[in-house]
Amino acid sequence: MDPADLKSGRLAPADYASHFADAHPPLNRTQALIEAERCYYCFDAPCQTACPTGNDIPAFIQRIAQDNIRGAADAILSANPLGGMCARVCPTEVLCEQACVRNTNESKPVEIGLLQRFAVDGHFARPGKPLFERGMPTGRRIAVVGAGPAGLAAAHGLAWRGHDVTLFDAAAKLGGLNEYGLATYKVAGGFAQREIDWLLSIGGITPRLNTRLGRDITLDGLLAEYDAVFLGLGLQGVNALGIAEPELPGLRDAVDFIAELRQSAPEIVAVGRRVVVIGGGMTAVDAAVQSKLLGAEQVTMVYRRGPDGLSASLHEQQWAQTHGVTIRCWARPLAVEAEGGVLRGMRFAATRLENGKLVDTGEQFVVEADMVLRAIGQTYRAEAAGSAIALEGGRIKTDADGATSLARVWAGGDCRAGGRDLTVEAVEHGKRAAIAIDRALGLATARHFDQEATHG
């Protein structure tokens, strides 16, 4: 019996560099100045209202137009300390750029994301006086568990206020989703770690890696040692398909596939000749597109509901299709097709809506595959933080500032109930929690970021 066609090195060596290069190359200075001049600099700007972090978009764009890169970066990073990453991965087409007045008038919004990236990257490339200087030490110690976007934002905000922060993470690197969970072409050039280096440069943040809550540390232990705890745990579990899933080469979780690509040279990552990705979100798109970029000949995304139910944005769907990915809706996984321990494909049941409920039509079909990637969502594992913390919808219940049911414990990011699983929203959670923790400790101050714009 022929083995599954699952292997690495499907492309010529030179192809990998181009395939996994920056998906959206940055603007040069001339392009940025021209694009900045398109902004109306609206008063009460709808783009700013649409941004979860309240980024003063007209202000930073006006500073770009004035060739004041430091001032533009100051405006961005004061609202969003992960402004460089968000410039790369935010779904701007459904947030700030959708709200742009130019979008209404001309169907072509100002390229806010690219301008934000231009300003932040430009500032990082220019050594000079730091935008943020740590406040006078308070003597208070805060544990931040999880070094993804929410945890990083919380740690930075707390350190800026003079608190000593220990930043715990289960992985070998800081960054969480930014380091392990995004397509390589979205964050090319090692930007995730460059941004983290900048965040840590404020001082007062001590990373502790390879340290997992529930295994190496406990919430009770942290509360005994620290004045407050922020949980930015993300979603550690992966949803199962709900069918028998034998252990087979090529049958794996999409998040693990994406993480492997982020931490390895692409030429050593194995991919099937024919790939099926089950799911309809951005993780599914990232896995499907990267499978094509690795040399897969046929990649099919399969989603159980109709096109309107896909959680991947229209932009992401079009991105997948332009890279040769087939998106097939109205089908649910029924069985793994295997023979002699070799993956051969997936059997699906065709579906439809009947009185608002998803039902099978009675039709079945098989999509041949050497590789099947599960991308049907992730779950919060409650056992890590313990049963004492209240949940809502399977995630941690909090108030608007991130305070949980436990005294001295805050939470934010994907582990927090009611969110949209957006990086920019996680940053806002961490930012607001830092303010709330500072206030709860009785140390809220009237300090403000230095807003004096100078040329970088």
State where each predicted segment sits.
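Conserved hydrophobic helix-helix packing surfaces used for dimerization/oligomerization
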Residues: 142-144, 165, 275, 299, ...
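Beta1/beta-strand and adjacent pyrophosphate-binding region of the FAD-binding site
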Residues: 137-150, 271-281
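Ferredoxin-type iron-sulfur electron-transfer modules and their immediate structural context
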Residues: 1-141, 229-249, 338-343, 369, ...
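N-terminal Rossmann-like FAD-binding beta1-loop-alpha1 element of flavoenzymes
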Residues: 141-166, 284-292
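A conserved short coil-to-beta-strand element within the FAD-binding core of flavoproteins
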Residues: 208-220, 330-342
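Residue-level detector of alpha-helix initiation sites
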Residues: 81, 148-149, 173, 281-283, ...
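Rossmann-like dinucleotide-binding cores of NAD(P)H-dependent redox enzymes
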Residues: 164-167, 171-201, 207-208, 288-335, ...
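FAD-site-proximal beta/loop scaffold in flavoenzymes
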Residues: 247-273, 356-420
